[in-house]
Amino acid sequence: MLKRLVILVFVCAVILVVAISPRGVEARKQLTVNRQCCDFSPLQILRMTAREAIGGVTYPSEIGQDKWVIGRMFPGVSTGFFLDVGSGHGTIGSNTKALEELGWTGICVDPFPSHMEGRTCRMERVVVSSAAGRTVKFHTHSGLGGIADSLGKWKAEAEKSPAVELTTTTLGRVLDGANAPSFIHFLSLDIEGAELEALRGVPFDKYRFGAMAIEHNDEEPKRSDLLKFLEEKGYRRVHSYKQDDFYAPR
């Protein structure tokens, strides 16, 4: 009875904030996002909105990937490990900054990172593919850069930026070099069309992932190929929202 009363008071407080507080407009936006982004239960939606609207907690990710990890997949976990491939800007749009603020550690992978001040992840300034030692042409566009042969939806925009030649490595080598744990709680993968090639460089018999957010940008057959590949590795798609598919072990 007491638990139900506490939940009722909590729900009423959130509704009050959303309805009439000075933060109401922003809170309503947060409520809408939380209803759609992360496969939350109704109570989880309210809790997440309360953290943002009342508690002032911020989640920098573009479409709620960090909220999904924190609120849906690993609630209460403060010692998780992540692999952020295509980490880009260290704060704006980051899928892993909020995890670090909870105490998580991890690896950030990006050949041209920016604004990493204050971040604690091990920074690997490399380009990853299915095999190491390949020379690739890489467009350096901030946020949309990637391997020239793999660029998809934003190719025309990315090609406006300078291109450089880089030598590939694999995610397996990155993980081995960092002495990463065999269980990685969260993989964030956003490298503008080269996601499947990067995954082919992971020794899945050595490393397992508890949750994955992988960008697809509605590009076919890339999206379907990603799904098939990950299903063969023992994962299932548990959620989709905007440009990302979300995976967990079967």
Predicted regions and their residues:
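Phosphate/nucleotide-binding beta-alpha loop and adjacent structural elements of enzyme active sites
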Residues: 2-250
